[in-house]
Amino acid sequence: MRVQFRHRPVTLPKDLSYYGANYSDRKDALLYEAVRDACLQSSEDIDFSAYDNDSDGEVDNVFILVAGMSEADGASSDCIWPQHGLLKDSGAELHLDGKTVNSFTVSCELASDEGSAPRPAGIGIFCHELSHAFGLKDLYDTDGTGSGGNAPGLWNTSLMDTGCKNADGMCPPNLNAIDYELLGAGICDTLEIGDYTLEPVNRNGHYLIFETGNEGEYFLFECREASGWDAPLGQGGLLVYHIDMSEDSAGYSDYYGRELSAAERWELDQINCRPDRQCAEIVAADPTATDIQDLFFPREGVTNFGSETVPAFRGNDGSSSGFALLGIRRNQDGSVSFSVARPVVLDISGIFQDAAIISWEIDDRLADNQGFEVEWTDGEKRETRMLDSSERSFTVEGLTPQTRYRATVRLVMSDEQKFSMSANFTTKVYREGTYPYIYLRGSDRNTDGTFVPGSKIPLRIFNATGVAEVRWFFDGSPVEAESDGYFTVRRSGTLCAEIYYEDGTEERIIKEIRTR
């Protein structure tokens, strides 16, 4: 990004202590007067109408670089605190050369250590504050120790976090995928199955996005190379961000004294104020990271990112993305490469009153595995079964009619890594006062009701309670469901269900099956 300025030195009519005075509810309460006074002095030889690039009637931004030190560095309270603001928020109006002056940014000439050792300030704070004028948000913890304590935010990887202070402000980081997404200035591709090589995001603005099923919640993927402006970023690699701009609750705000939604946190400059509920966070390759390099993929023992890895590729509600990044690696040219796969693909189309058939397929690259763990829960009771690596289907029995369940299939690799996929389903309704019948819905049938040879029948009885056992016969010979949970109809014949109830009674239901 390249920005051009017209600059002019001005001496304001009042002392710094006047403009920099702090009130009980805000810092630099009269700073808007400094902006107005500076613009009025500059209007003699600056045509403000030339600085409305989007023709919205407003000057795009006025930047005031104040002589002296910054209150943010610990200098006296008379000094200015770097900031971006709008004149209208202070009730001020200024019109010059037919344009409205509204947006302003202020930074300071000198950096210091708690008001001592003054030195020329680096460009970091300048770039940070100017970025607010472009629409970027503060991504550090803006309420400090409030709202549960200091949140890590984006560490020093981001210009909008502590990265603006890298190398004493002399080496602020490049714009990242979050910045490009907010600005609409990058090249964004949706994460899909395939092989990827991402160049450092500063080279071409290219990054990836994965949108969860929750509107406003998504993941971003970018490559960062530890060189140039990003030199302070360890060894670089793949960074993963989890962004939440949804309407979901995002915790209590000490500053506002109420619960805020994630969307409100973005509106109110409270994005990363809660350590337990950040709305723009790095999914660190090492969740216990204490060193910046531990944020990046790959690291020792961590070359994959999926639903069962640590960290996990899951939404705030715990739902699996269904995708996994495999074989993440750095390349000599600074890029990163990886493959994206769907390790497990679920199908729960066979849903009955008391059972469900769970089927799955796996990515061919994950064939070297120990087997599968199938789990199902109604939110209270949880059950699991371990299956051989050759299995691709499992019938869950003993379910309750009209009940919501969540099923998960975990692929267990030979090295103990796991990948999973989950899906919700609701069992069918039990109809009181109706007779039991053989359930045939969903089978492949012709318009005249005959079955297509090769049709699948689930061998299930509906509307029967207190059943101890059901035995199935086709043309008098015993039959049972195959490995996929279904019986395959290959010819015409008579299907019979012998039902044995817990009270000792028995019942037979017969259905003529015709194929064509």
Predicted regions and their residues:
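Hydrophobic beta-strand segments within extracellular beta-sandwich modules
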Residues: 407, 495-497
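Solvent-exposed segments in extracellular or luminal domains encompassing
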Residues: 396, 485-493
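Non-catalytic C-terminal accessory/binding modules of secreted extracellular proteins
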Residues: 2, 74-116, 183-345
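Extracellular fibronectin type III
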Residues: 414-429, 507
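Beta-strand-rich modules
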Residues: 398-415
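Conserved aromatic anchor
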Residues: 354-367
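Extracellular low-complexity, O-glycosylation-prone stalks/linkers
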Residues: 365-384
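Active-site-proximal segment of zinc-dependent metalloprotease catalytic domains
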Residues: 1-169, 176-181, 250-252, 256, ...
